[in-house]
Amino acid sequence: MTLIEDSRQQKTKHELKHAYWSEHGVRVFRSKLLVGDYALMPSLAKIVDTKASMAEIAQNIGGSREEHQRFIRELKLAQEVGSKLFVLVENTEGIECIEHVISWHNPREEYSAKCIQGPQLAKAMRTIEGRYGCMFMFCTPEEAAETIIDLLR
């Protein structure tokens, strides 16, 4: 099995994933992907876009207008090219599904009262799934490499 990793992914931040793939005989080829971070060769029917934390996806969805628009452009592009996009949110808060997001507390609230909170984030995720055909998935950083392979198969 050969996995394509977007060349814009920072190599040193994904060593845990690379170690897992190496142990399991998964070859990793780095190349620029049109959308997302990971796909299987030769098909781009399924793509995984990884988020390093709940805070990152909260910024993508409820952060600045520019950040939100960039995220939506990526979702639309995946939809236009016929790829199923999985947004995989790595987290250590025990969040395993969108329903768990409702009880998530945004640590940025300490600095900004306007930041998106769990209930609004969960509602936005459901809306985005319905509108753009993507799926939000959740796992721990330790599970990410295996989850990426499972989603792409």
PLM-predicted stretches and their roles:
Residues 1-43, 57-153:
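Non-catalytic C-terminal interaction segments of nucleic acid-processing enzymes
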